């Protein structure tokens, strides 16, 4: 099943729902960063969450940044997701592995840690970005981002995220975000029914492994609540905006002395993109050209 995002409404537009499948892009991130099982789950959950949050933004260039800094051995992670369906990200300590938790599942909460902060930045592409910071609740990602949505955006929300990874790689990943808007929030019976449905879920990835599509998952959750699945399906993918030219621009900022030192010491330069793991190499000749450009710009 292709990585994709779909949107839906229910309860006469009083409920907003978004679902995303991110199996392939999570596997690409795992391979690019050489992630452990638990690091794959942590980053995969957060990339799915980033795409779900970004989906509510209207501007084509709008993006959501999620940064988590916890006291666990993973140390932290960063995700950049756009409403155009692109996402990238990295973890600070990609190789750490932990024993399964008490439920026999990957111990994402233990890896991230329960003490720390979740930072969310919404950037419309113009003006000042909107940023918010909340304390971590559990380090399990979904609970922490739900806490952010309820406290910072004052929107009752339920977020279910999952990543299933084996020795063969990621076989299922994605999530569902359901939000109760003000017009439906006063209907206690509706809210209780929705909470009961979500609590009864065994997780997101088991549904994908059973072969259910996002539409079928929505039917299971909201089918008797006036569900309307919007026709537009958006493809999502791992995509990094790094390039060789951007790398040269970053090197140029270092200045002539540092560039000359790289030429003398290393006969060139090598840089690795944090977001995607792509390695770029600049020759001594290319560094010399940057030095010439700096001299010309300085008028000498």
Swiss-Prot record:
Give compartment(s). Cytoplasm
Q: Which UniProt keywords apply?
A: Chaperone, Cytoplasm, Disulfide bond, Redox-active center, Zinc
Is Cytoplasm tagged as a keyword? yes
Q: How is it modified after translation?
A: Under oxidizing conditions two disulfide bonds are formed involving the reactive cysteines. Under reducing conditions zinc is bound to the reactive cysteines and the protein is inactive.
GO MF annotation: an example:
protein folding chaperone
Report disulfide bridges, numbered on this chain: 240-242, 273-276
InterPro entries referenced in this protein's UniProt entry, alphabetically: Heat_shock_Hsp33, Heat_shock_Hsp33_C, Heat_shock_Hsp33_N
Q: State the superkingdom.
A: Bacteria
Keyword Chaperone assigned: yes
Q: Which family does it belong to?
A: Belongs to the HSP33 family.
What's its job?
Redox regulated molecular chaperone. Protects both thermally unfolding and oxidatively damaged proteins from irreversible aggregation. Plays an important role in the bacterial defense system toward oxidative stress.
Record-linked PANTHER family: 33 KDA CHAPERONIN
What is this protein's name?
33 kDa chaperonin
Originating species: Cyanothece sp. (strain PCC 7425 / ATCC 29141)
**Gene assigned in the entry:** hslO
């Amino acid at each position: 099943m292709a990585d994709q995002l779909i949107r839906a409404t229910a309860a006469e537009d009083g409920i907003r729902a978004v679902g995303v499948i991110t199996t392939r892009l999570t596997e690409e991130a795992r391979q690019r960063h050489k992630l452990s099982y638990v690091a794959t789950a942590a980053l995969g959950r957060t990339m799915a969450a980033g795409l779900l949050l970004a989906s509510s933004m209207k501007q084509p260039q709008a993006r959501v940044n999620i940064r988590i800094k916890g006291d666990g051995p993973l140390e932290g992670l960063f995700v950049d997701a756009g409403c155009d369906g692109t996402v990238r990200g990295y973890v600070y300590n990609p190789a750490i592995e932990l024993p399964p938790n008490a439920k026999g599942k990957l111990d994402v909460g233990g890896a991230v840690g329960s003490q720390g902060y979740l930072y969310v930045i919404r950037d419309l592409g113009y003006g000042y970005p909107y940023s918010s910071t909340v304390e971590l609740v559990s380090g399990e990602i979904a609970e922490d981002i739900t806490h952010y949505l309820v406290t910072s955006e004052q929107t009752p929300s339920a977020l279910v995220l999952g990543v299933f990874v084996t020795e063969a790689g990621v076989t299922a990943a994605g999530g569902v975000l359901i939000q109760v808007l003000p017009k439906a929030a006063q209907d206690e019976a509706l809210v209780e029914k929705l909470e009961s449905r979500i609590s009864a879920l065994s997780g997101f990835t088991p549904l994908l492994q059973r072969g259910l599509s996002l539409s079928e998952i929505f039917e299971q959750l909201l089918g008797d609540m006036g569900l309307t699945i919007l026709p537009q399906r958006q493809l999502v993918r791992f995509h990094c905006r790094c390039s060789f030219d951007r790398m040269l621009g970053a090197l140029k900022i270092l200045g002539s002395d540092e560039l000359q030192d790289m030429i003398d010491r290393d006969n060139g330069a090598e840089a690795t993109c944090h977001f995607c793991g792509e390695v770029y190499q600049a020759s001594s000749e290319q560094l010399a050209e940057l030095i010439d450009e700096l001299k010309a710009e300085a008028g000498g």
